[in-house]
Amino acid sequence: MSQQLQQIIDNAWDNRADLSPKAAPADVREAVAHAIEQLDKGALRVAEKKDGDWVVNQWLKKAVLLSFRLEDNAPMPAGGYSQFYDKVPSKFANYTAEDFAAGGFRVVPPAIARRGSYIAKNVVLMPSYTNIGAYVDEGTMVDTWATVGSCAQIGKNVHLSGGVGIGGVLEPLQANPVIIEDNCFIGARSEVVEGVIVEENSVISMGVYLGQSTKIYDRETGEVSYGRIPAGSVVVAGNLPSKDGSHSLYCAVIVKKVDAKTRAKVGLNELLRGD
């Protein structure tokens, strides 16, 4: 079934300029709708780890993008206090008390999750925003005013602190989603965008900005890397001087690495403050 879906969606993507809400074959509409439904249930996901490496299911990302071409904007009620006008309904628009109980997560008003996002058991959504295609795994806290971008992959027992921004793939169009692996802590007002991967058990301090062009400086080795935070890293904001010493530019600094056992025993503040 997935292979047939993929073929229909790949073909539709190649001819996307011909698609509109009023001009789309029935099989394309059905395939895109089914893909979004499976993303919403967590049965399919845009990226998954296989044999230790993250593999992006590009056809599912295409399905998310195609869904915007196939739907018209429509009024959407917002609990009596306002009204929205959009193409993607709320994930919880038709939820009953039984549906919420079966889901096993908390949604604190006015948190928003779009249909096509997956929210696992024991997740807490404080007043925050989770976009279509995102996957938020068990036990994760999405704190107040945090945003989880389209198709972003958030692991188990992650804490996204207040105001954290996790980038999406839709605007601007990105090749790969942001991935935050299990047991990570992302500090307040930090931003992780452009398909950066933060590996498991890492701690990102407050106000750290990570994109594909951000230099990641390892204090222990002196190495500079891009696009990936190694497992167990403790990261703070910093600067690297230019070769001529005339200026410095922003970077992220890996100040230490800890194993999962240390991460579990030691408080976050102690990890960030220690030498």
UniProtKB/Swiss-Prot annotation:
<dbReference type="InterPro" id="IPR005664">
    <property type="entry name" value="DapD_Trfase_Hexpep_rpt_fam"/>
</dbReference>
<keyword id="KW-0457">Lysine biosynthesis</keyword>
<keyword id="KW-0808">Transferase</keyword>
<keyword id="KW-0012">Acyltransferase</keyword>
<dbReference type="Pfam" id="PF14602">
    <property type="entry name" value="Hexapep_2"/>
</dbReference>
<comment type="similarity">
    <text>Belongs to the transferase hexapeptide repeat family.</text>
</comment>
<comment type="pathway">
    <text>Amino-acid biosynthesis; L-lysine biosynthesis via DAP pathway; LL-2,6-diaminopimelate from (S)-tetrahydrodipicolinate (succinylase route): step 1/3.</text>
</comment>
<dbReference type="GO" id="GO:0005737">
    <property type="term" value="C:cytoplasm"/>
</dbReference>
<keyword id="KW-0028">Amino-acid biosynthesis</keyword>
<dbReference type="InterPro" id="IPR018357">
    <property type="entry name" value="Hexapep_transf_CS"/>
</dbReference>
<keyword id="KW-0220">Diaminopimelate biosynthesis</keyword>
<protein>
    <recommendedName>
        <fullName>2,3,4,5-tetrahydropyridine-2,6-dicarboxylate N-succinyltransferase</fullName>
        <ecNumber>2.3.1.117</ecNumber>
    </recommendedName>
</protein>
<dbReference type="GO" id="GO:0008666">
    <property type="term" value="F:2,3,4,5-tetrahydropyridine-2,6-dicarboxylate N-succinyltransferase activity"/>
</dbReference>
<dbReference type="InterPro" id="IPR011004">
    <property type="entry name" value="Trimer_LpxA-like_sf"/>
</dbReference>
<dbReference type="Pfam" id="PF14805">
    <property type="entry name" value="THDPS_N_2"/>
</dbReference>
<dbReference type="InterPro" id="IPR001451">
    <property type="entry name" value="Hexapep"/>
</dbReference>
<dbReference type="InterPro" id="IPR023180">
    <property type="entry name" value="THP_succinylTrfase_dom1"/>
</dbReference>
<dbReference type="InterPro" id="IPR037133">
    <property type="entry name" value="THP_succinylTrfase_N_sf"/>
</dbReference>
<keyword id="KW-0677">Repeat</keyword>
<dbReference type="GO" id="GO:0016779">
    <property type="term" value="F:nucleotidyltransferase activity"/>
</dbReference>
<dbReference type="GO" id="GO:0019877">
    <property type="term" value="P:diaminopimelate biosynthetic process"/>
</dbReference>
<dbReference type="GO" id="GO:0009089">
    <property type="term" value="P:lysine biosynthetic process via diaminopimelate"/>
</dbReference>
<keyword id="KW-0963">Cytoplasm</keyword>
